[in-house]
Amino acid sequence: MNNLSTIQKKLLSIKPFLVTKYHVSELGLFGSVVRDDFSPMSDIDIMVDFSRPVGIEFIDLADELERQLDRKVDLVSRKGIKPKYFDAIQPEIIYV
């Protein structure tokens, strides 16, 4: 996956599966993938929220996303982001 549009389309196509298997309620792209500095070496920054508490499923979800997107994924939980960091990334988040 090498551009925002392609990544968005892929995430939209697999979102029903992610909702069912991993209890995903929200996915948001941020970081270099939504800015002009995304490169072949960049990872994909994804913020996720869940409809119920998860444990090891978080790691399984990260692995699944890396497999589906064929690129390293930096997955962060919405609830795990400190407010000052969320405030910094919020303007650039693109929800899928």
Residue ranges and their predicted role:
Residues 1-26, 34-36, 40, 51-96:
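Catalytic core of pol beta-like nucleotidyltransferases
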